[in-house]
Amino acid sequence: MPPEAWNPKPSGRGRRTRRDGLDNTALRHRVDSRVGGTIGPMSDHVRGKVIIVTGAASGFGRLVAEKVGAKGARVVVADIDAAGAESVAAAIRAAGGEAIHRGTDVTDRGDTTGLAALAVDTYSAIDVLVNNAGIMPLAFFSDHAAAAAAWDRCIDVNLKGVLHGITAVYDQMIAQGHGHVVNISSIYGNVPVVGSAVYSATKAAVNVISESLRAESQGRIKVTVVRPTGVPGTGLGASIVNGEALVGLVGQNMELFRQRATVVFGAGSPDAKAEFTDPEKITYWAISPDELAAQVVYVIDQPWGVSISDITVRASGEQYLF
């Protein structure tokens, strides 16, 4: 049976008609009305929240900032690229949202403290911090000469940057009686893999820091770890030192991975590309930044009493092992 036989034809993006005449959106509304749930269109727990997003001048961080801004959050756009952060904040305001910006180097504790102070001075609260800034210098130990500086930077941004962000908002969140820290980790932090010693170590550290914060702050600060798999288009690929180091995460699937990548990003026909780039299909190959950003918004868009503490976001047809 061909793969497409497993995929019901959608009547529109995100809408499927059932035998009882309900599409999936209508069904979600029915479930919400019966059990008082907060899923889907009924949820409105982003509006009014003060949300700091780091690494938000471009790529995935920008998408998160724009999406929460569109849902009524008061957004603090932070990035080492101050002009880029200013542009994103301006775009949110132009779309009818509320946003400010600050040029912020998350490796500098003073910068992150200043970022938190700006949020409090402007909005009198910090409800959510999205620790998103990060780099991914994949390389083997044999690449140490070429990778040394990138590895140092990786530790500073991915590990120290997360810690600086947490400590910058911690006192304010405790004082106001609630808060939510969303740390962007990775499946690379799940297990040791070749070609990713330093990057994986930083993400494993983020997982441990997150769980420690959750345990120390129960009933006061919610903590969510988001573990994406491969997400082309976020800009992370630009920091890879040795592309062959991807082998650690795909292992024996490397050849198939390359074939799929060639179809999706290279010489594939429109029909072939659609087979692997349509999230409505079970063969969906790589999570898009937009799809991932939507999941981050989802974990924020919960009542204060509900905490989604850990979420792994995968494409169902991917080749990653862990």
Q: Locations of the language-model features?
A:
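Active-site Tyr-X3-Lys motif and surrounding loop/helix of classical short-chain dehydrogenase/reductase
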Residues: 114-121, 140-141, 149-156
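Canonical Rossmann dinucleotide-binding motif of NAD(H)/NADP(H)-dependent dehydrogenases/reductases
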Residues: 43-76
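Active-site helix of classical SDR
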Residues: 166, 202
